[in-house]
Each structure stands twice: as C-alpha cells, then as structure tokens.
A protein has these predicted regions:
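Contiguous, well-folded functional domains in the mature portion of proteins
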Residues: 1-198, 203-204, 217-221
Length: 221
C-alpha cells in the first residue's frame, strides 16, 4: 500500500518537459485537462468583455500550471472560498481561487484563474506582481485538482472546443489578434475670425476722426 501511495503522489506531482510552439501570437494551454467551457463573458477581475476558456483537471492530470502568454504581471488576486466540484459553473465565483492578470508586450490583457475543487484544497502561486514571465513558464500548482479559467481579449481566435483534451503548453487554445487601440481624441480645430484689413483698421480710424472733430471748448471742459 505504501508503494502504491508513493507512486500515486509521484505521478501527481510530476512536471514533464514539453515542446511549445514559437508562434508569438499563440496562447498555450496552462494545464493538462479537458475543455468544459468556451463562451463570451465579462472577466470579473478586469471588468472587460472577454472570451473564456475553462479547462478541468482530474486527479490523474499534471497539475502544474504554466503561463499561457508572456508579459508582465499586472495584478494577482486571491479569494477564499468553498470547495465545490470544479466542473460546476458556480465554482468560478464561489470556490477558492487565485487570479493572475498579465499584460503582453503589445498591451493585451490576459487573465488566468486557478480554481480549487472538491478534492483540491491548496493553491500555490510562485510569482509576484511586477514579475515578467515567459510563455510556458511554471507559475503555480493546485494540489489534487481542479480547474483553470483563461479570459482572452475579444480579438483572440479560440482554437479549442468543449470536450477537447489539452496538454499543458503543447496545445494552442487560441491566437491573439491585433491589439485594439483606444480611439485617439482629436482636438477640435478652432477657427478664429480675423476679418479684412479694412475691417481691422475701421475702429482705429474712427477713434482718430473723433479726436479731430472735437471742439476746443469740449477739450477745455
């Protein structure tokens, strides 16, 4: 029994080397597992409209998490919560979770969330806000579970579908599109009415004429 337990733990904590695409626009799977959700959703951690890909891990999958994109960590948010079955929709909002938001070199924001599950009771995160991470770099671990949600920009093209199996860093789950630039605010051009030379000179000429026509007694007064 001891050896069986030892083999199970050794397999669970394994972290095999993987081949990864060199496509800079590729978003790689952060974990081994099965896609259970592909939909548009408002990311609760950035407030942006996004495309969501959820990947569920069973106890036999590799549970090391890898960064799906390269960039700088903008924020990390940890939430205490319940330990519901991670395949349930409400697990995204109610379970213990850790959300990391990364901004890519071209300014695109990608958020990925470690979610604990029914068996998993421990989320580990090895990175800090401000760290610059490479794509496919190990950043965390969920012991004995569970699920990772990836929130992508709306311009991204999702390449996986519900029910599809993923292999961490080997499976490309999406490709980032071109970054959407905010509209440039143009200052309104203000046209100043200058008028003709004659119109500009008229007030000055009128003032001179008034001074000449003034009577001596008026000046004396």
């Amino acid at each position: 029994i001891f050896w069986l337990l030892f083999l199970f733990v050794a397999q669970f904590f394994r972290d095999p080397a993987r081949e990864m695409t060199d496509d800079e626009k590729a978003v790689v799977a952060p974990v081994d597992g099965r896609v259970i959700k592909v939909e548009e959703a408002v990311c609760p951690y950035t407030g942006e409209q996004t495309k969501l890909v959820s990947i569920f891990m069973n106890v036999f999958n590799v549970h090391s998490q890898k960064t799906p994109v390269a960039g700088k960590i903008e924020k990390i948010e940890y939430f205490h919560g319940r330990y519901l079955n991670a395949s349930l929709d409400k697990a995204s909002e109610q379970n213990e979770r850790n959300a990391m938001t990364v901004v890519t070199e071209d300014g695109q924001r990608v958020c990925f969330v470690q979610i604990a599950g029914l068996v998993a009771r421990r989320i580990l995160c090895y990175r800090m806000v401000g760290d610059v991470v490479k794509k496919g770099e190990r950043y965390g671990f969920i012991r004995f579970g569970s699920r990772v949600d990836v929130y992508l920009p709306m311009s991204a093209q999702v390449l996986v579908s519900i029910g599809e199996k993923t292999t961490g860093v080997e499976t490309v789950i999406a490709r980032l599109g071109e970054p959407v630039q905010p509209p440039v605010a143009h200052e309104e051009e203000t046209t100043e009415t200058v008028g003709t030379a004659e119109e500009q000179a008229a007030p000055e000429a009128a003032a001179q004429s008034s001074a000449v026509d003034a009577k001596p007694e008026d000046k004396a007064q």
